[in-house]
Amino acid sequence: MISDEIFEQTGISSFLTDCATSQLVDSLNWRIQNGIDKILAKPIIPADLYRAVRDSQLVGMSGYSKEGLPIIAVGVGLSTYDKASIHYYIQSHIQMNEYRDRVILPSATKQYGRHISTCVKILDMTGLKLSALNQIKLLTAISTIDDLNYPEKTDTYYIVNVPYIFSACWKVVRPLLQERTRKKVQVLAGSGRDELLKIMDYSSLPHFCKREGSGSSRHSRNGTNDDCFSLDHAFHQQLYSYVKHQAELMEPTTPIKQGSFHVDFPEPNPADAKIAETLQSEFQRLGIQNGLSNSPDNVNISID
């Protein structure tokens, strides 16, 4: 018998009419076979390694919208994913998904007095360059994991600090997106600050939206770290403490083991694979068109 809790945590109850039974079964099997229910008791250690992951996989939570939806910030352009193995980045991503579903969303539901099951994502494109091609395999794996196992968790995607290279790629990628996804995406001018303040208070704005100009600023205010990507930010401190505490509860007399938590990578969704292929072609075309090196490792695109 499948419990209501599993349906709630996986977000499946809201889209059963659109989801094949086989996908539901596959998702539950994926959780069982990979021990996903225990992933929040598997901290990435030592702390220096986790800090390196946080410094190269820029994701965080900056606050809540006026309606109580968690604000998830993603530093798409400046994430390098080059400080650890792919397994640590996958592990960290799934841990944030699970922490959102098991802790953040239930807490928001209680705090705001209504059921909250989705979040708002703000994607910062500052620093986007051709070297992003190197990360397509990892990003496609993460996207596929989310599509198959954490569906319909994002209410709206806001894209900010957009350089020319993104604008050009967006024109060719947008038609490939499913209509329901396309409707969720809003590309804002500059840092998007004015538009975002319509749905959230200033204190909930990600740090990269608080500057008058574009760009990801990292600064402290009133003695607190304002950079929601940093391990020193309150959100990541709470998440990391939670995971370490769960590990101690599970095996109180055993030292926490080092090593990544390996998760099977699903086959890429054909639609995601098509988008990745299109992005790669467009990035390469832009590089040639602008007289840039074809090697993605040493090419920077200015945001002028």
Where in this protein do the model-derived segments appear?
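Basic, amphipathic alpha-helical/coil surface patches used to engage anionic, phosphate-bearing ligands
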Residues: 1-304
